[in-house]
Curated annotation (Swiss-Prot):
Protein name: Protein pelota homolog
Entry-linked NCBIfam families: pelota
One Pfam family of this chain: eRF1_1
PANTHER family linked to this entry: PELOTA (PTHR10853), PROTEIN PELOTA HOMOLOG (PTHR10853:SF0)
Role according to the record: May function in recognizing stalled ribosomes, interact with stem-loop structures in stalled mRNA molecules, and effect endonucleolytic cleavage of the mRNA. May play a role in the release non-functional ribosomes and degradation of damaged mRNAs. Has endoribonuclease activity.
Gene: pelA
SUPFAM superfamilies the UniProt entry points to: Dom34/Pelota N-terminal domain-like (SSF159065), L30e-like (SSF55315), Translational machinery components (SSF53137)
Top-level taxonomy: Archaea, Nitrososphaerota, Nitrososphaeria, Nitrosopumilales, Nitrosopumilaceae
Length: 349
């Protein structure tokens, strides 16, 4: 999340992914003020004429928040409230309006007092490391950007190579150029590029992009042991031990380790973990939760209840990670009841 502190009450934000939208859902409360650009339909009253359909104009307003909700399917946040200020005198104050906040939209949040955990949520969003994953062979290349635990895919790029059975004038450098251009569109400052796939193509591609002036500032890493290219190669990598080793500081690697530990404890019949909302809620009441992973499914079941629960855990210092169905790990957590946690000590169920 891109943030800018204006003064002690005002902070401007631009969410960069679905994790950021979730954090804003946890931060924005009833009676906060949201300032941003929107559109309103203005109608002109004219005597002796047909009803005016009105003109849609762009206007900057301040909205006093009454209700806020996530729309997980469309990756957006709906903020409802009443208009308290506007840049156009034709927009009446006190009328209801909704902001639809999407990824890369900007707003300013005004609070009478910012709580420490709210500021921490903004700062934690700024510290996430990004990885561009490239699963390449001579036939095609899968490309995805991993930020936090969210995996965003680009369409596969096909080389046009005819394979061993056909004689073609295949130019692999043209294929590499296409893949490089695609990577350049999603790379962000501080990202690393991780390249894998069968055979020697991955090394040849790594050498190719390291000659590019535009990509020289990015760290490039070639990974062995992932023997498939395309989208399948990306999924294979995110489930591998290699991912945990080379991306040990990433959220996905940490979450993967937590899930592995939960499954190990379950096999040992240990009571030092929880699965599902009720078990985790009870453990949190005792202050026993050390780290917790929850899926987007848990939010959808009862949004406000879950938001209150997450904020309570944040205040208790629990390490929390959100996952979604873009990764195999997210699907596993959903299958385990949407929430799993590791405990500081065993508790009786």
């Amino acid at each position: 999340m891109i943030t800018k502190n204006i003064d002690e009450n005002l902070i401007s934000v631009i969410p960069e992914d679905s994790d950021d939208l979730l954090n804003l859902r946890r931060i924005i409360k009833e009676n906060d003020k949201i300032i941003g650009d929107t559109t309103r339909v203005l109608k002109q009253d004219k005597d002796y004429s047909r009803p005016d359909k009105g003109e849609r104009i762009k206007v900057r307003i301040a909205l006093t928040v009454e209700k806020i909700s996530l729309d997980d399917v469309l990756d957006r946040l709906r903020i409802r409230g009443t208009i308290s200020e506007s840049s156009n005198e034709s927009v009446p104050h006190g009328t209801h309006h909704s902001f639809i906040l999407k990824i890369n939209d900007g707003i300013t949040i005004s609070k009478k007092k910012w709580l420490p955990f709210e500021k921490n949520l903004l700062e934690s969003s700024n510290n996430q490391v990004g990885f561009v994953l490239v699963a390449i062979d001579t036939g095609d290349s899968g490309i995805a950007r991993l930020r936090g635990t969210h995996l965003e895919f680009m369409p596969n790029i096909y080389s046009g190579s005819g394979g061993k059975r056909y004689k073609t004038n295949f130019n692999i450098e043209k294929f590499f150029e296409q893949v490089q251009q695609a990577i350049s569109t999603i790379l962000k400052e501080g990202d690393s590029i991780v390249i894998f796939g069968p055979g020697e193509t991955k090394k040849r591609f790594a050498n190719f992009i390291q000659k590019s002036q535009n990509l020289q500032k990015f760290k490039v890493q070639v990974v062995e042991g992932i023997d498939s290219g395309g989208e399948d190669g990306i999924y294979t990598f995110t489930k591998s031990n290699t991912m945990k080793e080379i991306m040990s500081d990433s959220k996905l690697a940490k979450v993967s380790s937590i899930i592995d530990e939960v499954m190990l404890l379950a096999n040992k019949k240990s009571t030092k973990f929880t699965m599902g909302f009720d078990e985790t809620f009870n453990a949190n009441q005792m202050g026993a939760v050390e780290s917790m992973v929850f899926s987007d499914k848990a939010i959808q079941d009862d949004e406000q209840k879950m938001i209150d629960f997450l904020n309570d855990m944040e205040n208790k210092g629990v390490k929390m990670y959100s996952v979604d169905s873009s990764t195999d790990i997210g699907l596993r957590v959903t299958g385990l009841g949407g929430i799993v946690s590791l405990l500081r000590y065993s508790i009786e169920s």
